[in-house]
């Protein structure tokens, strides 16, 4: 397992728990930080066989949303929609879980002359890693960009997911509360890179946050797969960000990291037991589980790019929020599974997405 982020550690945990011999390697020494909003939807957290409570810093049950800082609406869910964590703590926690399950962990290692024999290789070293290329996988990945920073804590934002849609073409701005600070950021299409710093300052100003108090300002890429992306070949596969498994609209990759890790682990166990000849069934499983959400994400992204007012007017409808709430909590597998008025709202949003295609 190359890379001990959420995807790599989850896959290592799953495999080791099933009795497989697993070597998990990473160039970093943990705990280490990663630029990321740090949110884990309840949908994602429910995938894990253990609780994330030890590293949760806030539980978000409120949505505060605007279109370019105007027409703001607020909604409150019946329960948590997402948990806020810091990657320093979350990733180390997941790594320790993998080690406790029996995975051999090697930190602070880079490519050198040592050789390791393995029946299966899984690349989980993120969008900046080299495993996909070395394994002849990946390709066809479209990148978005984001810029984030940390600012002093403000109780006004407790338990609240603040989203300012379309402040960046193809994306949004956010304010996420952590235990002792706020994470603020903006992200969108790669072409928006030169505007990110200016828009981050504006985001802060719009919410009464001092932009000069921002620290740890960092940029990063958001990898999004396309149908041309190869996820597996023979006894090799890529998962998580290394596979471009980031939602095109939300930019969330944590749910996809956990799902792809578990699907890859299941496929690997089939290979090890002789039930399968290679890891290709993993790619098919990703298509079944994640592709419908990815397709919906691309549709929502295009709708807000081309028809932002119409898309926003539909998104703020109470049935739309109820459908979103169920998706974030994992009570709906995909938007098309909505029923009643929620289904009607989703169909209207789909219609706008098709018109924007």
Map each language-model feature to its residues:
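Conserved FAD-binding catalytic core of PHBH/FMO-like flavoproteins
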Residues: 127-201
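FAD/FMN-dependent oxidoreductases across multiple families
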Residues: 190-276
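Redox-cofactor binding/interface segments in oxidoreductases and associated redox assembly factors
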Residues: 2, 123-124, 238
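C-terminal helical "tail/cap" subdomain of flavin- and related membrane-associated enzymes
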Residues: 266-357
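N-terminal Rossmann-fold NAD(P) dinucleotide-binding loop
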Residues: 8-9
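N-terminal FAD cofactor-binding segment of flavoenzymes
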Residues: 27, 31-65
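Conserved N-terminal helical subregion
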Residues: 46, 58-59, 64-134, 140-146
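Glycine-rich FAD pyrophosphate-binding loop
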Residues: 4, 13-36
